[in-house]
Regions:
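Active-/binding-site microenvironments in catalytic and ligand-binding cores
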Residues: 1-197
Length: 197
């Protein structure tokens, strides 16, 4: 796992004329993006991701899941039957409700995630980015990181630990996800913004 983030006071107004702190954290802390390089040696690194991939039309798929439950290909197809086909090069965001367990000990171990068939289906549609309100796009118990591997090989971006998805009242919206441009990094904390008409 990753260390707990910490803020280290470094300068202060009284002694230095200004306040400044140091920040120690994993690049995969909080709401964050995985670059393909996180799992593929020759995959794109976070600083190499183009702005075009970070600004897109997005579909919000609401599929409440309990711990250890898969988001399936059928879940996605049910959404498409009701709301229309998901466009190529768009983003897909899954609202499972798992964020409500953020303070629970099992949050990082028993989370829901995508099934391999669901991941392959999204990859076949040339989806740009997939996001979820859990700590991993894979099931917590998947030590092979099966879905990460599928997406990384296709150059797809992953955003994990999304919050406040319940505030998005539309199945379609405009998504902006802004990582830090950290050279050669495997990921970055992000600010994810939904614009709903």
């Amino acid at each position: 796992g990753s260390p707990q983030p910490s803020f280290i006071p470094w300068e202060n107004v009284k002694e230095d004329g200004y306040n400044l702190e140091l920040l120690f954290l994993s690049t995969h802390t909080g709401t964050h993006m995985d670059a393909p390089y996180h799992f593929i040696e020759k995959g794109a690194k976070i600083h190499e991701i183009s702005l075009e991939k970070l600004v897109s039309e997005a579909a919000l798929i609401q599929c409440r899941k309990n711990g250890g439950e898969f988001i399936t290909k059928i879940d996605i197809q049910k959404f498409e039957k009701k709301h229309g086909k998901i466009a190529s090069f768009s983003s897909v965001i899954f609202y499972t409700g798992w964020q409500r367990n953020l303070q629970k000990k099992y949050y990082f171990e028993k989370n829901p995630g995508l099934s391999v068939s669901a991941a392959k289906y999204l990859a076949s549609k040339k989806i740009n980015l997939v996001g979820i309100d859990s700590p991993s796009i894979d099931l917590g118990k998947d030590s092979k990181f099966s879905v990460h591997q599928i997406f990384a090989k296709k150059g797809m971006l992953i955003v994990e630990n999304l919050a406040n998805l319940e505030k998005i009242k539309s199945s379609k919206f405009h998504l902006v996800v802004l990582p830090l441009k950290l050279k050669n990094a495997t990921g970055s904390p992000v600010r994810a913004i939904a614009f709903v008409e």
